[in-house]
């Protein structure tokens, strides 16, 4: 569903306009003739402006020619010479018939009316550019523009209103009538692609009408030339002639090819257009496409049988005239590497887009010089191999080492590919340069099944390679060596039997191979001998039978040698088979006897012989036919004469006892001879038919155990299973199926047992049959499937018969009851094979059916199943904005960063479709906003809404953001901050009344106390007075740290830089003006803005940026924050699943966050809360973990990042325990873990957490889940208190971002817990 927009990323159609200049692909023109073509002797060619006509016409007039001005010279003239009067005649432009919009009066006009002389050639066209008409006057837009319109009237174009239309018309004064108004309107509609007008105007009478005033083009010429696919389709439906020719001999296909309309070309070819049609100058459509460089069209033409060797009247082939861009297609080199890669990787779509007869056997330019077939065969791409073979791939092609594709397939054991290649004539004993055969390859790699296949096609295991080794020698196991020898002997015997070569049979015959079966067909030597056309087949048959051949052995179709002999009327060997005990009534897979086969073939004498041997003519096949019914009139006559006409008394009593369920009588009467007797006076039913139809379970069981035939058919072709199913006898049906009854057998009306059960509403029977492979798509003689026969309202059976489709439909429609009834462990992940290959969960997720999705997930649905586009259910939910579904899928551990075939993640989907809440949910659970799709786009690149863009920018790490979005934070080392140097932006500190212990002693505004390591007041020599920073930090603050090496090499400090100008900076190698300007202005602002002792900090505070003050580890403030963090580690109920397993942090860095704007916003909100809460703002220092930390320190807390699915709704969550916040660092529940290792318990990667000032104000105490978007009325926050079945530790939730200030940014690692022994040792050492 969500993938329907993919095509826009992969297909971009570019329409190339015709150029007025002569094309480079035109053949060199011959010397100009004495007269300009198309002008009367003694006539001076008129200039384009003289007649008001453009020098060439545009493609919109329905005709495309590869060269000349759009017309063809008479056959006896050179083609398209330059005009003798020097006017610019374009040798490669095309003339298209022009249709004037105004009515044309069919009157005779003098030649002076348009300034054009009559055409003496009589071809209806002129070669002079001055004779080409244009849709507009010479001052209008270029005729090559496809969008330009027709002239409003002939006079507007400088042509007399009485002149005929178009350049293809005879000159004025010739008396040719003008085109009728209705036809003109039709041609104009075809040209413009107005399909509704075309449908209104076209009919059988005018669909092939010619533009008699122009080039005699048909409407199809116009529509094809302009690429109007819809119009072309309609015209073809109306009977348009794809072979219609205009004056120049062009068919519509020429036009479509000339202008590169590949879809129209395909359409015309599919409708029978001749790809090798020649115009009057023997130009084919391929000439046209090649000259114009229409690569796609060239490929389509070649794929449809275009002959690249056809030459025009000048003796030029398409390759000779091809534009350079198209030459590669005609040499087979076009995108050869891509074609080979498509064959290797199995990319059918790509392969078929490039494959032509010219490149189907191309060889790679490097490596092994493989062909596409070599690669497809070696990589087991069965479908690709099929396609290549269908399109003429050479099975004998050799690579650099002399290997044929069969070598590759056999070497890697690809059975199906090997079979395909052999079927298409691959040489089974082909040798490479080292004389290795495919059998050598297969045997040496122990490809047992492939070896058998090769041997069955004549592979010789005795052939030796260049090392003198045979395939048998190279077999790695004794078992394979023995098998190769055995099968080779067996196949040799089969071949000798086929040839009825008595001497060879005697030579190869051995006891162990007498009943050897061909692995694929299961034929024995006896089958081969009786089928042989050679005269000694009888002697060979006798020899084989004497030596122990099984006379009743069956091949894969269950045919005995007697079946084979009878079918071929080999009566001589039938006699031998009968003498050696052949079963006369053995059945093949179709339930046919040898008599059926002989009757079907019309062998009268064979039928007589079989009847004399005891064949039963009353046996009914699985299709419901007796032998007589399958034979001709003569066969029917002799068979009907021998058919018994009444049932014996014993048989009659047995049939009645079976019907009545009289088991004792059945036991007395039943024998192996009459267990399958027939009710000859009735329906020819057997005892089993009666017992099954009357639900006599015990009788059915007894008959089955004593040889009753479950496949026996009555007169109507019904088997016992039909009877049981029709009457709903479940136990009997189950018995019959268990004893091998065919669930898909059909009667004479092609009703299967499933038809019977469905029509009678037998739900359980239908279920049983389907479970055992019944085909619900089979149709009866009336074309009805079992589903069509279900009674209206019987929805349970309807759903059952629809099978997977019903479950998919129920999931799509959100019908939980149907889903519960239909869902089984076998079909819970079934696929919509007619659509996107979606699972029920895909559909439930895409259609927002929460209850269905939950049921499917609870019962084992695959949460990460991919459809044919690679989308998982979360893609669907994200694409359509179904937040609850997405949350449910995440709960069941779906992959939030799963990618489809185009590398789109669910976050890409949500961002592109403007799903804000979905983006927040995905990001909160670890979605990676930096992942790129195949086109290199991140979700941010696809975001359509401003709030989503802001959300994604906040979630992305700074290094992944585009430069324009990167927040600039200044990091200042602790050593640069003196006690008195606190910037003004830190002075607005709030109280920390609620803090106790070491944290309560922290000075809010300062970074350290007076005794904690400051830089001192003394300055080093050479520093600018009052500056507490070095040149490296200054460059970093400007984003110019890459210039540091230059400054260090030249020993330039800040005081030296302060005296430098543009010229001096340029001399030391800083050539970019922008860099020099930034340096000079930066120093000026730095010096001009000094306040206190640290003007650098003041400067940045003025600019409202964020400053990160590095605290020194020995600083009391650092130590207090670390102690608070370490001391609040707790053990959580999830056992470390979310935040990792640890008992201590390794604190790497603690930075104080300074941002004047955020501080002021926090203080303002704190004041509001205090006023609303009796002057108590209730501030706490709390921890916060989030994937948005980088955004928070720059922009503050943003409630848009919140997810409504949290325990207390869409709030911002804080904790007094650092280990609780650690669980959210990579997202809710730990997200997907660290970005590098995808590990929630990673001990390597650095993490970041915030220690924040939070104004709680009046808090609402809550013990259970409550979804809120805002704080409860009269309250400013929610405190989730611990309870028995609720929270283990308290959570603090605010719903306005300005109620918290990120005071400290802590960078840390979790530490792996020490082993107990190590802990004990450490404790002892400490003691």
Curated annotation (Swiss-Prot):
Keyword Transmembrane attached: no
EC number: 2.4.2.30, 2.4.2.-
Biased composition (Basic and acidic residues): 69-82
Inhibition and activation profile: Specifically inhibited by XAV939, a small molecule, leading to inhibit the Wnt signaling pathway by stabilizing AXIN1 and AXIN2. Inhibited by talazoparib. Not inhibited by olaparib, niraparib and veliparib.
Biased composition (Pro residues): 25-36
PROSITE patterns reported for this sequence: ANK_REP_REGION, ANK_REPEAT, PARP_CATALYTIC, SAM_DOMAIN
Enzyme class (EC, first level): transferase
Subunit structure: Oligomerizes and associates with TNKS2. Interacts with the cytoplasmic domain of LNPEP/Otase in SLC2A4/GLUT4-vesicles. Binds to the N-terminus of telomeric TERF1 via the ANK repeats. Found in a complex with POT1; TERF1 and TINF2. Interacts with AXIN1. Interacts with AXIN2. Interacts with BLZF1 and CASC3. Interacts with NUMA1.
Descriptive protein name: Poly [ADP-ribose] polymerase tankyrase-1
């Amino acid at each position: 569903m969500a993938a329907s927009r993919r095509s826009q990323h992969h297909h971009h159609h570019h329409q190339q306009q015709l150029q007025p200049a002569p094309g480079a692909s035109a053949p060199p023109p011959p010397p100009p003739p004495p007269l300009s073509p198309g002008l009367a002797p003694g006539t001076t060619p008129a200039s384009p402006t003289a007649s008001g006509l453009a020098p060439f016409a545009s493609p919109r007039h329905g005709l495309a020619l590869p060269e000349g001005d759009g017309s063809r010279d008479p056959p006896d003239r050179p083609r398209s010479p330059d005009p003798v009067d020097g006017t610019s005649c374009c040798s490669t432009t095309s003339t298209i018939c022009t249709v004037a919009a105004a009515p044309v009066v069919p009157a005779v006009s003098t030649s002076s009316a348009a300034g054009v002389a009559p055409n003496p050639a009589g071809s209806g066209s002129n070669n002079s550019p001055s004779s080409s008409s244009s849709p507009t006057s010479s001052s209008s837009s270029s005729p090559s523009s496809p969008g330009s319109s027709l002239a409003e009237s002939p006079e507007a174009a400088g042509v007399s209103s009485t002149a005929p239309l178009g350049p293809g018309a005879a000159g004025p004064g010739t008396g040719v009538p003008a085109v009728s108004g209705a036809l003109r309107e039709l041609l104009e509609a075809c040209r413009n692609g107005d399909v509704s007008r075309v449908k209104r105007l076209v009919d059988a009478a005018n669909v092939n009408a010619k533009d008699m005033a122009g080039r005699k083009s048909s409407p199809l010429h116009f529509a094809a030339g302009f690429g109007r696919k819809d119009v072309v389709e309609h015209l073809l439906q109306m009977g348009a002639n794809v072979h219609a020719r205009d004056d120049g001999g062009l068919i519509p296909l020429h036009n479509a090819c000339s202008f590169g309309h590949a879809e129209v070309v395909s359409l015309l070819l599919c409708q029978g257009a001749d790809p090798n049609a020649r115009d009057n100058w023997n130009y084919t459509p391929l000439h046209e496409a090649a000259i114009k460089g229409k690569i796609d069209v060239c490929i389509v033409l070649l794929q449809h049988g275009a002959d690249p060797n056809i030459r025009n009247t000048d003796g030029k082939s398409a390759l000779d005239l091809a534009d350079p861009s198209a030459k590669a297609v005609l040499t087979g080199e076009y995108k050869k590497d891509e074609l080979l890669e498509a064959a290797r990787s199995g990319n059918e779509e790509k392969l078929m887009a490039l494959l032509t007869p010219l490149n189907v056997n191309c060889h790679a330019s490097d490596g092994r010089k493989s062909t596409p077939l070599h690669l497809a065969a070696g990589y087991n791409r069965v479908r690709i191999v099929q396609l290549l073979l269908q399109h003429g791939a050479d099975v004998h092609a050799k690579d650099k080492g002399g290997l044929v594709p069969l070598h590759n397939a056999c070497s890697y054991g690809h059975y199906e590919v090997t079979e395909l290649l052999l079927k298409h004539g691959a040489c089974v004993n082909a040798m490479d340069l080292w004389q290795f055969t495919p059998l050598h390859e297969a045997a040496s790699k122990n490809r047992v099944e492939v070896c058998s296949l090769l041997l069955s096609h004549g592979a010789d295991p005795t052939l030796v390679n260049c090392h003198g080794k045979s395939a048998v020698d190279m077999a790695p196991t004794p078992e394979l060596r023995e098998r190769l020898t055995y099968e080779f002997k067996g196949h040799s015997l089969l071949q000798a039997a086929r040839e009825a070569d008595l001497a060879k049979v005697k030579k190869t015959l051995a006891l162990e191979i007498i009943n050897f079966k061909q692995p694929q067909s299961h034929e024995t030597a006896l089958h081969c001998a009786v089928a042989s056309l050679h005269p000694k087949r009888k002697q060979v048959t006798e020899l084989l039978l004497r030596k122990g051949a099984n006379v009743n052995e069956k091949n894969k179709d269950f045919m005995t040698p007697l079946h084979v002999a009878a079918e071929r009327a080999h009566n001589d060997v039938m006699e031998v088979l009968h003498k050696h005990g052949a079963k006369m009534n053995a059945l093949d897979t179709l339930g046919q006897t040898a008599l059926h086969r002989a009757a079907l073939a019309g062998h009268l004498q064979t039928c007589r012989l079989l009847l004399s041997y005891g064949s039963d003519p009353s046996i009914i096949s699985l299709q419901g036919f007796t032998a007589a019914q399958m034979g001709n009139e003569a066969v029917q006559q002799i068979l009907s004469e021998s058919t018994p006409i009444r049932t014996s008394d014993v048989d009659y009593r047995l049939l009645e006892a079976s019907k009545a369920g009289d088991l004792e009588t059945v036991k007395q009467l039943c024998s192996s001879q009459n267990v399958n007797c027939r009710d000859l006076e009735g329906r020819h039913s057997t005892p089993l038919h009666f017992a099954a139809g009357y639900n006599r379970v015990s009788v059915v069981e007894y008959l089955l155990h004593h040889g009753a035939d479950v496949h026996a058919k009555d007169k109507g072709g019904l088997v016992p299973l039909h009877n049981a199913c029709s009457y709903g006898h479940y136990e009997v049906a189950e018995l019959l199926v268990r004893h091998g009854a065919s669930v898909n057998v059909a009667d004479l009306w092609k009703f299967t047992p499933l038809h019977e059960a469905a029509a009678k509403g037998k739900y359980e029977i239908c279920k049983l049959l389907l479970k055992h492979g019944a085909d619900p798509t089979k149709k009866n003689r009336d074309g009805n499937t079992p589903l069509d026969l279900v009674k209206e309202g019987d929805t349970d059976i309807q759903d059952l018969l629809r099978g997977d489709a019903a479950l998919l439909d129920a999931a799509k429609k959100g019908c939980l009851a149907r889903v519960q009834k239909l869902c089984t462990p076998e079909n819970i992940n079934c696929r919509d094979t007619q659509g996107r290959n979606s699972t029920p969960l895909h559909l439930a997720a895409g259609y927002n059916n929460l209850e269905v999705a939950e049921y499917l997930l609870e019962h084992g649905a695959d949460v990460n199943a991919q459809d044919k586009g690679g989308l998982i259910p979360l893609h669907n939910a994200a694409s359509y904005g179904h937040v609850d579904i997405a949350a449910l899928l995440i709960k069941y551990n779906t992959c939030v960063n799963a990618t489809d075939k185009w590398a789109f993640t669910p976050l890409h989907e949500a961002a592109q479709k403007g799903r804000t809440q979905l983006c927040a949910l995905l990001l909160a659970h670890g979605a990676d906003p930096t992942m790129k799709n195949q086109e290199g786009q991140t979700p941010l690149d696809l975001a359509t809404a401003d709030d989503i863009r802001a959300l994604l920018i906040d979630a992305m790490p700074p290094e992944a953001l585009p430069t324009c979005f990167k927040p600039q934070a200044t990091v200042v080392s602790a050593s640069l901050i003196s006690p008195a140097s606190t910037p003004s932006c830190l002075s607005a500190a709030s109280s920390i009344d609620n803090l106790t212990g070491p944290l309560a002693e922290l000075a809010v505004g300062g970074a350290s106390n007076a005794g904690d390591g400051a830089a001192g007041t003394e300055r080093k020599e050479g520093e600018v007075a009052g500056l507490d920073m070095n040149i490296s930090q200054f460059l970093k603050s400007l984003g110019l740290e890459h210039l540091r090496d230059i400054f260090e090499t030249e020993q330039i400090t800040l005081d030296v830089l302060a005296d430098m100008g543009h010229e001096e900076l340029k001399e030391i190698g800083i050539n970019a003006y922008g860099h020099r300007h930034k340096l000079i202005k930066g120093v000026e602002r730095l010096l001009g803005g000094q306040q206190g002792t640290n003007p650098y900090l003041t400067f940045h505070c003025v600019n409202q940026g964020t400053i990160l003050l590095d605290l020194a580890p020995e600083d009391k403030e650092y130590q207090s924050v670390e102690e608070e963090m370490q001391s609040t580690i707790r053990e959580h109920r999830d056992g470390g699943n979310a935040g990792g397993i640890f008992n201590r942090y390794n604190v790497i860095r603690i930075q104080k966050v300074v941002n004047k704007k955020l501080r002021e916003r926090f203080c303002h909100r704190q004041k509001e809360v205090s006023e609303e809460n009796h002057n108590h703002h209730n501030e706490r220092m709390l921890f916060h973990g989030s994937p948005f930390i980088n955004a928070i320190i720059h922009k503050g807390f943003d409630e848009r990042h919140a997810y409504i699915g949290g325990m207390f709704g869409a709030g911002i969550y804080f904790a007094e325990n650092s280990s609780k916040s650690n669980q959210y660092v990579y997202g809710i529940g730990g997200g997907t873990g660290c970005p590098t290792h995808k590990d929630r318990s990673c001990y390597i990667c650095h993490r970041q957490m915030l220690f924040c000032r939070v104004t709680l104000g009046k808090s609402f105490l809550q013990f259970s889940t409550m979804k809120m978007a805002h704080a409860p009325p009269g309250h400013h926050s929610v405190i989730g208190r611990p309870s028995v079945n609720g929270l283990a530790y308290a959570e603090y939730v605010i719903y306005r971002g300005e109620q918290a200030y990120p005071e400290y940014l802590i960078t840390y690692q979790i530490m792996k817990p020490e082993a107990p022994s190590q802990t004990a040792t450490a404790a002892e050492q400490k003691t």
